[in-house]
């Protein structure tokens, strides 16, 4: 993505590619790219130094993941506390949930005030990015529940077919 953005910058005589290094780092970390490659290391470190994307920033700062001013999140923070939530939305989220997450990544939409869908907050307003963080958490919990349900089925099959006796 970054290479494509730098190419567009060249064609259009602009300089916007650097603005997306945070998303480049998120993608590289989420895809578990080989960090022995110096170019990959560079993109990850530069992206983590300058997290600008509203949703990415909100996910880093949610639920006790608060960083002091100037503190840089670590790769493991993103790998364990951000990427799995986005992955869950992509895998088991509804179209509406995916749209909320996508729009929360857009600077011009992320901080729009919308009616809250949070339980007990009827009639209140919240930002799209706040709602998106809650939606991502809800979807991740739903994915965990699905995994737990399937594990029960798998364990039953293993027991019924004596598959541990091999």
Give the location of each predicted region.
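Hydrophobic helix-and-loop "lid/oligomerization" segment in the mid-to-C-terminal part
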Residues: 9-166
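Short amphipathic alpha-helical face segments that pack within enzyme cores
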Residues: 2-3, 7
